[in-house]
Amino acid sequence: MSAPDILKDFKGSLTIEQDGSISSASGILQESFYNNKEFASTIISMLHDVNKITSSNNQEFKRMTVSFSEQTFIVTAIGTKIYVVVQ
């Protein structure tokens, strides 16, 4: 299954590099957050906090979900890239 097939059910997607730059965006995330370093650094900061918690409990971090009344952000870190999708 290709990335476009996987992402078709989401309202938008974003790829953040390790340095905080946004390398790609689509859908509502492109409209709202593309080139927004503050959004990217907030996501990275949240991941650092989660990593501290999971490391202290010997748990492996896989995915973080942040839910609001109108939308849900799903954040996944794989290698040096951070993928964000919104439902």
UniProtKB/Swiss-Prot annotation:
Keywords (A to Z) from UniProt: Lysosome
Keyword Ligase: no
Cellular localisation: Lysosome
Main location: other
Biological function: Regulator of the TOR pathway, a signaling cascade that promotes cell growth in response to growth factors, energy levels, and amino acids. As part of the Ragulator complex, may activate the TOR signaling cascade in response to amino acids.
Source organism superkingdom: Eukaryota
Protein name stated in the entry: Ragulator complex protein LAMTOR4 homolog
PANTHER family referenced in this protein's UniProt entry, alphabetically: RAGULATOR COMPLEX PROTEIN LAMTOR4
GO BP term, pick one: protein localization to lysosome
Keyword Transmembrane helix belongs to the record: no
Family: Belongs to the LAMTOR4 family.
One GO CC term, this protein: lysosome
Oligomeric form and interacting partners: Part of the Ragulator complex.
